[in-house]
Swiss-Prot record:
Pfam families according to UniProt: TACO1_YebC_N, Transcrip_reg
Name of the featured protein: Probable transcriptional regulatory protein BVU_3469
Source species: Phocaeicola vulgatus (strain ATCC 8482 / DSM 1447 / JCM 5826 / CCUG 4940 / NBRC 14291 / NCTC 11154) (Bacteroides vulgatus)
Alphabetical keyword list: Cytoplasm, DNA-binding, Transcription, Transcription regulation
Cell compartments where the protein resides: Cytoplasm
Organism phylogeny: Bacteria, Pseudomonadati, Bacteroidota, Bacteroidia, Bacteroidales
Example of a GO MF term: DNA binding
GO cellular component: cytosol
InterPro entries linked: Integrase-like_N (IPR017856), TACO1_YebC-like_2nd/3rd_dom (IPR048300), TACO1_YebC_N (IPR049083), Transcrip_reg_TACO1-like (IPR002876), Transcrip_reg_TACO1-like_dom3 (IPR026564), YebC-like (IPR029072)
């Protein structure tokens, strides 16, 4: 299934963490989308994608509408997407994706965790070569659909030929070039796919083996980072736990 499949499979269920934190992070994404393209989903592709993700994460409709309304009434222009990267314990690369209105606070918070766990926060871009930046779309599967044909249609947007299928949820997830986000979303919607949720992710291109004890320490570091409201997602190049470890 390729180098990234086991990582994606292992991280899918823990993509957003606890529900309350999930809604906070999605609310911030709604605010950014509204600020950039307005409050009407039909005229704002980015907002449509976020709302579809909200629905998939079981965010109540009232919460979504309130987040849009709040975004219209406050200044969200100071929110910035910032990434922080470095090495955690045992030489594992750690990539922290944030949305913040105070970079001084955020970098101090992130650095404190790296220091606490004996890691080293590097400069922006220093570990970018270890991760592939991708846009990711999840949508409802159509009965009798031909995935090979769909992937072929999207080849100009550098969509990977590998995809994830969740039979229980009846969804397909594809990965492509971040620069082609809007074009991929438009194509999927024009093809009649429902609940097209869009996002961005970082996938490690070289997974590092760790012992169960090392994994426990690294998991604690990731959990500590995810406690900060500014942190959207934490990525590592730690190899997923085997079934024996679990």
């Amino acid at each position: 299934m390729g180098r990234a499949f086991e990582y994606r499979k292992a991280t899918k269920l823990k993509r957003w963490g606890h529900m309350a934190k999930t809604f906070t992070r999605l609310g911030k994404q709604i605010a950014i989308a509204v600020k950039a393209g307005g409050p009407e989903p039909e005229n704002n592709p980015t907002l449509r994608g976020v709302i579809a993700t909200c629905k998939r994460e079981n965010m109540p409709k009232d919460n979504i509408e309130r987040a849009i309304k709040n975004a219209m009434g406050k200044d969200t222009s100071d929110y910035k997407g910032m990434t922080y990267e470095g090495y955690g314990p045992h030489g594992v690369a750690v990539f922290v994706d944030t949305l913040t209105d105070n970079t001084t606070r955020t970098v101090a918070d992130v650095r404190s965790v790296f220091n606490k766990f004996g890691g080293n926060l590097g400069t922006t871009g220093s570990l970018a070569f270890l991760f592939d930046h991708k846009c990711v779309f999840t949508f409802k599967k159509k009965e009798g659909m031909d995935m090979e044909e769909l992937i072929l249609d999207l080849i100009d947007y550098n969509v990977e030929d590998e995809f994830d299928e969740d039979e229980e949820e009846g969804t397909i997830t594809i990965y492509g070039d971040p620069k082609s986000y809007a074009a991929i979303q438009k194509h999927l919607e024009e093809c009649g796919f429902e609940e097209v949720g869009g996002d961005f992710t970082y996938i490690p291109n070289d997974l590092k083996d760790v012992t169960p004890e090392q994994r426990e320490t690294l998991d604690k570091m990731v959990e500590r980072l995810e406690e900060f409201d500014d942190v959207q997602t934490v990525y590592t190049n730690m190899k997923p736990a085997s079934e024996e470890e679990e």
